[in-house]
Amino acid sequence: MKYISILFLGLFFIIGCGDNEKNNPAEGKDGQNEYSFDSTALKTETLDNPNQAFYLRYKFKTGEKVRYRVTSIMNNRQHIEADTVMDQNVKQTAVYLIDIDPVEVDAESVAELKLTIKSIKVNASANEESFSFETGTSKDSSEIVKFAEYAALTNNSFSIRLSKSGEILEIFKVDKIVNQYLKIKGYADSLNAENKVVVRNQIITTGLKPILSQVFRELPEKKVAKDSTWSFVQPTSRILIFQMEATTVYKITNLEKYEDNVVALFDASLITKVEGQTKYTDRGINYTFKKPITTAAGKVYFNVESGLILKSKTDVNISMANTMEMDSPKGKIKGSQSENQKITYIVEKI
């Protein structure tokens, strides 16, 4: 039976930081747990003047490299009723170690940054089957092909141009990533220039932007203080047959001190508007979709003095469902599908 699979697109434009999780997924080199992520709240102190006004700005300086650990945790539960009943539970944790090297900062504080994803560790399970992959350690060619997207991203530097308010103006110099991906997949000599452009755009959109959007957040141009709010309208996205408009809303909750630095804490939330017809017919199958429900919340710690995110955590929950009906020689066949996904993103400056 043909069945439309519900695909959830991670909402990468919200940031936040929780305060009660700690996990240790893998041991790193020399006994150091490079992949150990910690989402517990930073232990900040009270600032003498928490009501002062300030600017939120990125302040990268040439020669001062920065490393981040970005962790993505996905839990997906799917229930399908058709000829049979099927439940599936998929979990995946991916940890990225990213080096940022400021190459140039111009007079308008636009920074050219060279980024290198040094390594990626993936732990996943689908129902009772588990697997793991760490870039740079596997010698199994079939395993590398299976995880080509991760393998190609690792140790192939690329560049971005970033405004002082966190807007990514350009992503470029991704040729090494594209070429490595095509080589691993065996397409290096078989794709024409047009198809290579398509692959390049897909790598930027699905491989790089989700990670970059966790480290670089759009900040307000105006001066802010405690209780200040600002928002950004995101590009319209398509989920199945629906168009979704999303607005990220931020609010400064406090100004505190961490290791003698002034740190701004701000909450993030998401407002969504979903439009589109709920009914869809494809090759004789009639589908009725419920509009997706999306919620997101969290907190971010931003070092006002150094102009960098210190820590953040994103919690995004998405629920979608649909029913289907089709005619057959034995009468009508009906089915239903529901899917609930929670995605957590943790960013740590290390």
Language-model features: where?
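C-terminal motif of bacterial Sec signal peptides marking the signal peptidase cleavage site
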Residues: 13-16
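Signature of exported/secreted
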Residues: 19-350
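Positively charged n-region of N-terminal signal peptides that target proteins for export
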Residues: 1-5, 18-20
